[in-house]
Regions:
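Short glycine-rich loop/turn motifs that provide flexible caps or phosphate-binding loops at active sites
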Residues: 40, 71, 117
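A solvent-exposed, acidic/Ser-Thr-rich amphipathic alpha-helical stretch
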Residues: 45, 51-102
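Hydrophobic pocket/interface hotspot
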Residues: 31-34, 46-47, 54, 72, ...
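Residues at secondary-structure transition points
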Residues: 22-25, 67-74, 120
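Short, low-complexity N-terminal intrinsically disordered segments enriched in polar/charged residues
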Residues: 2-52, 153-155
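A beta-strand edge to alpha-helix "cap/lid" segment located at domain peripheries
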Residues: 7, 11-23, 81-155
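Short, mixed-charge, low-aromatic patches
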Residues: 31-41, 64-67, 83-87, 107-109
Length: 155
């Protein structure tokens, strides 16, 4: 059940659009901060922005060690450790944030260098983040999985 929905009532009181918009703005700012933490290499600050039971979901691709669902801060920390071991970010461009209710969609473009193969892959992406009580509870990535998989394959 959503606590805030446009035009809905909660406990007999009308919930105004201003309150929804304010929550959406705060959620967007939180998401912007985690991207800033990632850019700065401050993974502990990024992890502090996540709920204890966060779900971090990336596509499962054969031969790509950073695919799958990572549950909880500890596993997400392991995800970022593995990510750093196997790839290096060459570009991260955030183009737009779209917020509605408890979700923020980050749209952008990135380029990665895969250390084992020497290949660079790049893609536009959409990241869907869910926010509750000032923490990220879910991250879902949509990207060019063919380009990602190809970059990890030798040859």
């Amino acid at each position: 059940m959503r606590l805030l929905e446009r035009g809905s009532t909660r406990y007999g009181k009308r919930v105004g659009k201003e309150k929804v918009a304010m929550g959406e703005q705060e959620n967007t700012e939180l998401v912007q901060r985690i991207y800033g933490s990632f850019r700065d290499g401050d993974i502990p600050a990024l992890l502090d922005s996540l709920s204890e039971d966060v779900q971090w979901v990336t596509a499962e691709i054969e031969g790509v060690p950073v695919g799958g669902t990572w549950r909880g801060r500890e596993q997400v920390g392991q995800f970022f450790g593995t990510l750093s071991d196997v790839q290096e970010a060459r570009q991260l461009e955030l183009r737009e944030y779209v917020a509605q209710d408890d979700r923020v969609v980050a749209l952008g473009h990135y380029a990665w260098h895969v250390k084992a193969t020497g290949k660079v892959w790049e893609s536009d992406f959409a990241h869907v983040l869910t926010v509750r009580d000032g923490k990220i509870t879910r991250f879902q990535e949509y990207t060019d999985t063919a380009a990602l998989g190809d970059a990890f394959r030798e040859g």
